[in-house]
């Protein structure tokens, strides 16, 4: 086990408890069905984020643009969906930290950056990741679904040889997200 895995092993029991008590399952996103996955993601995103400071619902154009931009770097195991009876109730969006691909690219050459990024992604040598978004439907908050998603992300990131994660984009005034991250 890596240090990453050992530090957070307590989340296993929480995830198991949430699954057995509530019948919630977590699955990977499906890159081959990207359009439908984005639709499912947006249903939860708009409801989960509507009360966050500064939230503005994304337009269809923005969603399409983001999906096209993220598709080359998305690792399906790091974009989990939590489901209850086949309905999405929560999601996570974790992306590789591409800053490591920028290191050594002082020339600023786009082709070199893209080649290095592609190589790092294919050889699983990106050791860092960033939690970009986490969204849970309001009626499922406080029931451990966040712990279940964090557990999934931690486990799958470890399988990708990731040893470090960052949630620096988390809104400072989101006590639920802060508490979940601090418990990890």
What are these model-derived regions, one by one?
Residues 1-25:
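Acyl-donor-binding surface of acyltransferase catalytic domains
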Residues 28-136:
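A conserved beta-strand-loop-helix scaffold within acyl/acetyltransferase catalytic domains
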Residues 128, 132-136, 141-157:
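Conserved acetyl-CoA-binding loop-helix of GNAT-fold acetyltransferases
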Residues 128-129, 157-171:
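Conserved GNAT acetyl-CoA-binding A-motif
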Residues 180-181:
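Conserved active-site tyrosine of GNAT-family acetyltransferases
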């Amino acid at each position: 086990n890596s240090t990453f895995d050992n530090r957070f092993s307590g989340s296993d029991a929480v995830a198991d408890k949430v699954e057995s008590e509530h019948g919630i399952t977590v699955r990977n996103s499906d890159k081959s069905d990207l359009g439908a996955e984005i639709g499912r993601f947006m249903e939860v995103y708009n409801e989960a984020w509507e009360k966050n400071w500064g939230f503005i619902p994304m337009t269809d154009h923005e969603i399409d643009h983001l999906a096209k931009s993220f598709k080359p770097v998305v690792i399906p195991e790091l974009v989990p969906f939590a489901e209850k009876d086949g309905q999405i109730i929560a999601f996570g969006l974790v992306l590789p930290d591409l800053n490591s691909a920028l290191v050594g690219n002082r020339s600023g050459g786009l082709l070199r950056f893209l080649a290095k990024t592609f190589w790092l992604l294919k050889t699983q040598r990106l050791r860092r990741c960033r939690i970009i978004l986490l969204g849970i439907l309001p009626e499922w908050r406080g029931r451990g679904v966040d712990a279940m998603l964090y557990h999934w992300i931690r486990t799958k990131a470890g399988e990708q040889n990731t040893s470090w994660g960052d949630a620096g984009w988390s809104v400072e005034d989101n006590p639920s997200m802060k508490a979940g991250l601090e418990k990890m």
